[in-house]
Amino acid sequence: MHYLGRGPVVSVAVCNPCAQGVRYKNAMDPAANRLAPLLDRMVDYERLRPTEREWDLSGVERLLRRKHAAVPVRPAIQVAGSKGKGTTAAFLEAIGSAAGLRTGSYSSPHLITLCERIRIAGEPIRVECLQPVLAGLLDFAGDQPPTFFEAMTVAAVECFAQDQVDLAIYEVGLGGRFDATTAIDVDAAIVTRIELEHTDVLGDTIAAIAGEKAAVIRSGGLGLTATTGEALAVIRAHAERVGAELLVMGEDFGVHHIDWADDGARGLLSLPDGTRQQFFLPDAKAFELPALALAVAALSRLHSDLKLPLDPVPRPNLPCRFEVRTEADGGVLILDGAHTEDSLQAVVVEVQRRYPGTTPRVLTSLAAGKRWQEALSAVLPIADSFVVTELTGTPGEDPAKICAWLTEQGARSEVATDVASGLRKLREHPGPRLVVGSFYLAGAVRLLVDSHA
């Protein structure tokens, strides 16, 4: 395997798509069901989490450079980072759309339907549009089928070009250096925050992970970052090495004089051109402010003549990012895909700010190989009761193993056989009810709640 940041590429045998069996037929997602004959011809590393594969951009570059391939839309922005990249991409989409741009946004993972990954003007791509694009890519690839992520990435490029969007936004899936989105020409690359994540692939130090994500900043291009300390030093050194302009939050742009109220947050945004603008973000969460600053700074540089709507800021669609639902019994259900120590700490801060003095019950499941003990340790200061269930959509840690560890930490815990029973057990608690640990879990709970609304 090629461990990013740890050594040279080593050629290895990867799993043949046919050997994975039929994975999408009878899926809960109707779009995946319709696309199953195409999807089952691809390797899906999000589901397999294999220990061996070769990392490079040759496959996606081959698709992007094929004859009659679409010319990628410009301007385009790529968003990388351990924390906040999805929120930053969502702010780019929401503010750009409200300012009059027709946006195309590519993100992952999806919560309910894979069509969510490719959005045009805020709406998921229609399966009727996606199907012929994927079919064409697979026909071209022949006996060298792309991975699921590679195919969806190139499909996003094609769909944005066909629709003639004004702004393309690409969220990195994993890392940066060898992520499929890095094969696309962009006008700005954003690196949000860096933390220890995917250490088996990206490296086990902040410096190593920062080095992988810094690679999204192109030679002679524009980079923006909200990193600090060691991560910032690595990113700054990379930008200098490749001759890129780097804008740093807290130095070249930022958020100032924040005034919190029940209905949101008001303050000042400093922009790269030295100006300041007032903003009001309705229903603001603390973790959203760096994302807002990054998005506004990037848009102001790429569209200097565009009047950005900041008072109020248009709220982005952020499902399962501290999404609060009021249930039939009056209890509060909070859905969040946070699964790392830092992101869960941000959730804890928000719970304490909004619901002081309460003790939430937690429904969780975590992906295999994650630093799950460190992640759950962040939640223990506010919660002492947990329900642990199986993770669907990607390999997960054994719920019994997680429960045993929680018991050792002095918390009460029980295993639920599936997400539905886990939600029932969670609802036995008056609230708040907190769902964290995985976007797959949060999305599954969201689907259950919506289907019984």
Show the residue positions of the predicted features.
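Nucleotide phosphate-binding/pyrophosphate-handling subdomain across enzymes
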Residues: 75, 162, 167-170, 179-190, ...
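Beta-strand->loop->alpha-helix junctions that form or flank phosphate-binding loops
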Residues: 106, 225-227, 240-260, 280-286, ...
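Short functional linear segments
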Residues: 15-17, 23-81, 88-99, 106
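C-terminal helical cap/extension that packs against the catalytic core
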Residues: 228-238, 243, 263, 300-301, ...
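A glycine-rich beta-strand to alpha-helix segment
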Residues: 421-450
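ATP-dependent carboxylate-amine ligase catalytic core
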Residues: 51-76, 97-184, 200-202, 208, ...
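Acidic, Mg2+-coordinating active-site environments of NTP-dependent enzymes
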Residues: 144, 151, 164-171, 186-279, ...
